[in-house]
Every structure is written in C-alpha cells, then in structure tokens.
C-alpha cells in the first residue's frame, strides 16, 4: 500500500476533509486521485461532485480504473474524455457496499487508528452489502462472460 492510501493515512481521505477540498473547487474544477476506494468516491459524490473513472493503464484488469476524477458541476466536462470515462455498472454498485462507508473525523483531531476503528464499527452496523459478496458476484459475471 502507498503511504498515502486511505488505509495508511485516513486523515487525508475523511468525508470532512474531502468535502472541504470539494468546496474549494471552482465550477468545472477537477480533483484527480489514484484512489478508486469506494469510501473516497462516495464521500466525493456526497460532497456534490460528479464522478468519472480514470482509464486503466495497460495491463490493468478490464472494468476497473486507474483512479477517480471528481468534477465540480458547472463546467464543461464531457462524460468521456482523453483519460476518463463514466463509471461502469460494477463501479456504481461498489458505492453501495460496506466499502463505501466513509472515513470520518468530524473534529479533525482523530488519529489514524481512531478513524480506522470507528469505520470498522460503522461498517459492521451499516446494513450495506458486504464487499466480498459484491466481489464474488462481479468475478462470477466476468467468468460467465469469458466463456
């Protein structure tokens, strides 16, 4: 894992921090990240940004992405561009799994371990689809399509 990934440095990926970044974007402003975390993407979406998937690099599995582009409404961003595309159905569904439970730090003072521990508790109580069930379903779909 990257030193700045959501699991390593959740302070940079909390719902509150991402909402603050989003609020500072001009109309049409873009935030690009290597992260394809459902928690990060769902937080950006709740902050009012339009989400796009960065195109996969050569060798990456089909149907996934190289990251996320989040755009403040009001600009002239097209649905597809030289390095992005709309979310696939798989990516859209990912936002409704336990993986989409956000990292939270309302006061901006929690440690990494506190943020991660609170998220695990929220995931256990949230009632969303387990992420491993989503993964199995999509792996099964891919296996059927390749036959």
Predicted regions and their residues:
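A short SAM/SAH-binding and catalytic strip from SAM-dependent methyltransferases
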Residues: 1-12
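Short strand-turn motif at the edge of the Rossmann-like AdoMet-binding core
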Residues: 3, 34-38
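Accessory recognition modules or surfaces
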Residues: 11, 31, 59-75
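A short glycine-rich, Lys/Arg-flanked "PGG" loop and its adjoining helix->strand segment in the class I
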Residues: 11-27
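Conserved Class I S-adenosyl-L-methionine
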Residues: 19, 41-66
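Conserved beta-strand signature within the Rossmann-like core of class I S-adenosyl-L-methionine
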Residues: 27-35
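SAM/dcSAM-binding transferase cores
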Residues: 68-147
């Amino acid at each position: 894992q990257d030193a700045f990934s959501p699991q390593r440095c959740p302070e940079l990926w909390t719902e509150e921090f991402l909402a603050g970044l989003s609020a500072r974007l001009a109309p049409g402003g873009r935030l690009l990240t290597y992260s394809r975390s459902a928690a990060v993407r769902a937080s950006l979406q709740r902050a009012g940004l339009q989400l796009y998937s960065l195109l996969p690099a050569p060798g990456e599995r089909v149907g996934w992405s190289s990251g996320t582009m989040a755009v403040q409404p009001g600009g002239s961003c097209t649905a597809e561009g030289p390095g992005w595309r709309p979310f696939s159905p798989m990516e859209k569904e990912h936002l409704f799994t336990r993986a989409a439970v956000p990292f939270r730090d309302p006061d901006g003072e929690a440690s990494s371990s506190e943020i991660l521990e609170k998220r695990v508790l929220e995931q256990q109580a949230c009632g969303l689809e387990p992420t491993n069930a989503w993964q199995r379903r999509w792996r099964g779909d891919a296996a059927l399509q390749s036959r």
